[in-house]
């Protein structure tokens, strides 16, 4: 049985808000077709292969949005999921998948790397690049889908790319903390407001970025040092978003760097310091709209914009609707 309810989604506009699928109640062909269709609708275009084509495929799937994320729980028999270069040309699939295994084990391959993910550990997959997900036996996992910009706003893109198809162990450290948090989110039955979900999801992605960094995903000590410097500047910006008078020179001084060094850090990520500052302010404004009852003018001021009209124009160009309409639309989705 499959149940679907449509919703807006920043990563894939046709993704169902709620998914429930149990192939046990379907015949072999229908069950496999529904499974493959759900994969494509939720994540990206893929091919699915089964080790025993004539055997019934037993699987269960439940998932829902959680703030900017989508969290699913999966129990399934052995199968293999392949995303090819040709599929990427027809379906960009601009998100990331966090595959957290809770029972059994799976193998993931991407960018010339392969790793086995054991219970309690997780691996990251980039939907914009070819990958293989292989489960040799029945398994259970939690899958968290994050829009690309949500993760890369917290961690340099090159570090994220180097971090795919690597097992982040969950027995100790940040990896274990993040893994337990994602399991708790997936298992949560109590209702939560849209605003609260946005806040918790944002914190969860912060923790995920920390776990990826602590997993020694940097290619060299120099890369790690640059990542730490960039993170320090980003934290200074985030702590001063409310200050409309802060200058880029002020930000550099607070981070203990020259303005030239700060510009080089952001240029290496394909952006500019000012562009990142504006994006951070817009993201803060979006959170205020979803988590508070502040007026649009107050939201504009809290996010560091001098002029509410200028803020509204930037917000509309970034998120596709005015601040007031965005709040109303997402309040309906949350309810």
From Swiss-Prot:
SMART domains: HTH_ARAC. Induction: Constitutively expressed. GO terms for molecular function: DNA-binding transcription factor activity; sequence-specific DNA binding. One of its GO terms (biological process) is regulation of DNA-templated transcription. Pfam families: AraC_binding_2 (PF14525), HTH_18 (PF12833). Residues 249-270, 296-319 bind DNA. Residues 231-329 form the HTH araC/xylS-type domain. Keywords: DNA-binding, Transcription, Transcription regulation. PROSITE patterns: HTH_ARAC_FAMILY_1, HTH_ARAC_FAMILY_2. Transcriptional activator of nphA1 and nphA2 involved in the degradation of 4-nitrophenol (4-NP). This is Transcriptional activator NphR. It comes from Rhodococcus sp. The lineage of its organism: Bacteria, Bacillati, Actinomycetota, Actinomycetes, Mycobacteriales. The gene is nphR.
């Amino acid at each position: 049985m499959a149940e679907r309810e449509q919703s807006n989604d920043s990563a894939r506009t046709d993704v169902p808000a709620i998914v429930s699928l149990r192939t046990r109640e379907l015949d072999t062909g229908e069950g496999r077709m529904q499974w493959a269709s759900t994969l494509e609708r939720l994540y990206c275009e893929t091919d699915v292969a089964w080790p025993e084509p004539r055997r019934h495929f037993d699987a269960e799937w439940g998932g829902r949005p959680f703030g900017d994320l989508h969290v699913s729980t999966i129990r399934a028999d052995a199968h293999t999921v392949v995303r090819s270069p040709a599929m990427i040309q027809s379906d960009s699939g601009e998100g990331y998948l966090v595959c957290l295994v809770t029972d059994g084990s799976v193998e993931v391959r991407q960018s010339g790397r392969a790793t086995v993910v054991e219970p309690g550990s997780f691996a990251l997959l980039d939907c914009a690049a070819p990958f293989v997900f292989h489960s040799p036996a029945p398994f259970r996992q939690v899958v968290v889908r994050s829009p690309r910009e949500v993760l890369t706003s917290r961690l340099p893109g090159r570090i994220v790319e180097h971090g795919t198809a690597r097992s982040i162990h969950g027995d100790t450290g940040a990896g274990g903390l993040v893994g337990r948090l994602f399991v708790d989110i997936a298992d949560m039955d109590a209702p939560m407001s849209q605003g609260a979900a946005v806040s918790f999801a944002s914190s969860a992605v912060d923790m995920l970025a920390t776990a990826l960094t602590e997993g020694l995903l940097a290619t060299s000590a120099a890369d790690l040092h640059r990542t730490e410097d960039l993170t320090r500047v980003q934290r200074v910006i985030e702590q001063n978003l409310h200050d409309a008078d802060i200058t880029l020179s002020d930000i550099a001084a607070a981070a203990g760097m020259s303005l030239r060094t700060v510009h080089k850090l952001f240029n290496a990520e394909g952006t500019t310091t000012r562009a990142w500052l504006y994006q951070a302010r817009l993201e803060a404004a979006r959170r205020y709209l979803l988590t508070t009852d502040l007026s649009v003018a107050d939201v504009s001021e809290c996010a560091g914009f001098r002029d509410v009209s200028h803020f509204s124009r930037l917000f509309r160009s970034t998120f596709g609707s005015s601040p007031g309409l965005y709040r109303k639309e997402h309040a309906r989705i949350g309810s």
